Amino acid sequence: MKQQVFILQGDGPGLLVRRQQSAGLPVLYVHGATFPSALSVAYRFNGRSWMDDWNARGFDAWAFDFAGYGGSDRYSDDAQSEAIPGRAPQAAAQIARVVAHIVSLTGHSAIAMVAHSWGTMAAGLYAALHPERVARLCLFGPIAQRDERTEIGPSPQRWRLVTVAQQRARFIEDVPQEHPHVLIEPDLGMWGQAYLGTDSEAAHRDPPAVKIPYGPVADIADAWSGSLPWRPQDIRAPTLIVRGEWDGVTTDRDAAWLLSRLGHPVRRDAKISKGTHLMHLEHSCEGLFQAVREFLKEERP
């Protein structure tokens, strides 16, 4: 399916935006903390991506890269700055720019949003601030508020370096030892090379690694220390929480905390069998795709 890719310019960093056009409801994917749209919603296994699935169902599929990721502009590497780049308020402002473009271009007054992991924090903040722009909200592996002190160190960093080996270890750590692998591409051979390709400097590091903003780590630490940057009570759209059976980031308790506080009466929690926090890259992706598209297709109450 034909995909348009362009850089959205304006007030702020240039943002890479993807679109697979259809006349239906626009659906925007909001990626997580470590890899951009090309490696998530737009990545094709056996010739098919999640964006392709949305498009085939009649949805106008959109995605973008936050500043500091993929094809978008990088934050300034100012060693003198104490600000941690890539925090949720900055990310929510970038979502606002993308949604404004979608609304202007398509004529739809509101869109559906599917966000993953740390991206749910930025998406939740945006949806709380702009309820008129969000028709439906899907929180895939969301970060919930906890009341356990989580430290990120005495001197928070501005950047992280992430290797393919670290990504793979993270992807498989929640799978029970007695269970076969669940990744569609077990060794991440092609995915890993594509991941390193999202950072022009990655190959020059030893070991090769992708540089990403540290903001998401700080946001998650705050959330798990009792300070989520958005209030679920402020959400005014039907909301789906979707997570894997083996998701170590979004626990049953986390899902229950969010579900009990969401502000719209239509709120659901779907747990996908044999899936982890990264199930869009796993064999369980079909269950994820089905749960999300069925929710997106429902008539607004």
Region roles according to the model:
Residues M1-S22:
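N-terminal cap/lid segment of alpha/beta-hydrolase-fold proteins
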Residues G275-E286:
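Catalytic histidine-centered segment of alpha/beta-hydrolase-like enzymes
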Residues F64-P85, H277:
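Glycine-rich "HGGG/HGxG" loop immediately N-terminal to the catalytic nucleophile
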Residues S109-E148:
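Conserved hydrolase catalytic core segment
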Residues E148, I152-L240:
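Alpha/beta-hydrolase
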Residues L25-A63:
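Short, surface-exposed "cap/lid" segments of acyl-processing enzymes
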Residues G248-D254:
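Conserved alpha/beta-hydrolase "acid-adjacent" motif
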Residues Q90-A110:
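Conserved acidic catalytic loop of the alpha/beta-hydrolase fold
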